[in-house]
Amino acid sequence: MKKVRAAIVGYGNIGHYVLEALQAAPDFEIAGVVRRAGAENKPEELANYAVVKDIKELEGVEVAILCTPTRSVEKYAKEYLAMGINTVDSFDIHTGIVDLRRTLDAAAKEHKAVSIISAGWDPGSDSIVRTMLEAIAPKGITYTNFGPGMSMGHTVAVKAIDGVKAALSMTIPTGTGIHRRMVYIELKDGYKFEEVAAAIKADPYFVNDETHVKLVPSVDALLDMGHGVNLTRKGVSGKTQNQLFEFNMRINNPA
């Protein structure tokens, strides 16, 4: 069986778990890992793999799995698609998916490559489950309740804000698809908490939700990477009222 040669682009939490997934996949082989530091301070688990700064240094890459922050996905995907390399990402800014699809669709077709976008759990697998539930009960309302748990995308977004030393963003469900964001941060020296908190609340990841920012002495003491979702569809199948379908999932979020 010919194996697909995959490159891991970015080696944070997502990259680490993609490595494990590829190691367990019988139809894939790891071409190497692309990270900003290259082979400098190479983690022990990467000892047997090529670790480079530029994907061009790897041989025979057929697909690049993008494990970068969401806001970097478009840049890397366009670069690799232009090289004829297929891409897979877990882009998770819901309001930006249509624009990203339009951009990467054009780039992929131009260079005869394939780009699979938003292949995480939400957006991703949850999107498929929602569609299935809506097919079962075509008339009705679907409620998506996340957590309580750590949101990886929101946590990464907070860490990128000036003045934030460490961060944890928790998603708290309040029911019927409404959520509260609880953000815990450690502050860098020389920054005012009120200004940093205001910047967090103004970020696109948080601007549409009730968000509370808390200053804590240690984010690590609060850290639990568990997350989950409850999808509920209440509606009508044919002429039968009060149909109720649920899907529950609990996961290790970075995986």
Predicted regions span which residues?
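N-terminal glycine-/serine-/threonine-rich beta1-alpha1-beta2 phosphate-ribose binding loop
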Residues: M1-A82
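Gly/Ser/Thr-rich loops at beta-strand to alpha-helix junctions
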Residues: G12-I14, H94-I97, S118-D126, P148-S151, ...
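C-terminal substrate-binding/catalytic lobe of Rossmann-fold NAD(P)-dependent oxidoreductases
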Residues: H16, A24-I55, G149-A255
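Generic structural signal for hydrophobic
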Residues: E79-Y80, A108, V158
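General beta-strand structural signal in soluble alpha/beta enzymes
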Residues: D89, S115-A119, N145, L168-S169
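Rossmann-fold NAD(P)-binding glycine/threonine-rich loop
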Residues: F91-S115
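A short alpha-helix-loop-beta-strand transition element characteristic
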Residues: A113, K139-Y143, G163
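Rossmann-like NAD(P)H-binding beta-loop-alpha module
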Residues: S125-N145, H154-T155
